[in-house]
Amino acid sequence: MASKSSITHLLLAAVLVSVFAAAAATGPYCYPGMGLPSNPLEGCREYVAQQTCGVGIVGSPVSTEPGNTPRDRCCKELYDASQHCRCEAVRYFIGRTSDPNSGVLKDLPGCPREPQRDFAKVLVTPGHCNVMTVHNTPYCLGLDI
């Protein structure tokens, strides 16, 4: 029969293995190509441009059919991203203010990038896509980067 000390060590080892497995399964891998699509929220460009400046993007599909509007496509992309990566997807989408070439958003005729960035920060909120984030709320904190 196993001693009480051996059983305790086995239980402790089992608990540690479980903790490490859980941590590995929910790791913070939120980079394009790892945890996020290679070009996260590309489908949100049209919605952001429409809402910010009232303009469309040349070459983007135009549809008002339910389930296929720019908003629907954008929200589907956000919904399809894992909950713990949604804010990081928005961060990647808007880019960093210190690097004008980063992010998916671009200056468009009659629609500068800054207003687009400001609008994109609220994509996850109840007034737009209403998706839960890493904070267990439909909000992303600290997007002023």
UniProtKB/Swiss-Prot annotation:
CC per GO annotation: extracellular region
Domain of life: Eukaryota
Cysteines joined through disulfide linkages: none
Principal cellular location given in the protein's record: secreted
Signal sequence segment: 1-25
Gene3D superfamilies to which the protein is assigned, alphabetical: Plant lipid-transfer and hydrophobic proteins (1.10.110.10)
Pfam families: Tryp_alpha_amyl
GO terms, molecular function: alpha-amylase inhibitor activity; serine-type endopeptidase inhibitor activity
Keywords: Alpha-amylase inhibitor, Protease inhibitor, Secreted, Serine protease inhibitor, Signal
Record has Cytoplasm as a keyword: no
Tissues in which the UniProt entry reports expression: Developing endosperm.
PROSITE patterns: CEREAL_TRYP_AMYL_INH
InterPro entries: Allergen/soft/tryp_amyl_inhib, Allergen/tryp_amyl_inhib_CS, Bifun_inhib/LTP/seed_sf, Bifunc_inhib/LTP/seed_store
KW Secreted (keyword) present: yes
Subcellular location: Secreted
Biological role: Alpha-amylase/trypsin inhibitor. It could be involved in insect defense mechanisms.
Family affiliation: Belongs to the protease inhibitor I6 (cereal trypsin/alpha-amylase inhibitor) family.
Note: CM proteins would be involved in the cooking quality of pasta.
Stated name of the protein: Alpha-amylase/trypsin inhibitor CM2
Species of the source: Triticum aestivum (Wheat)
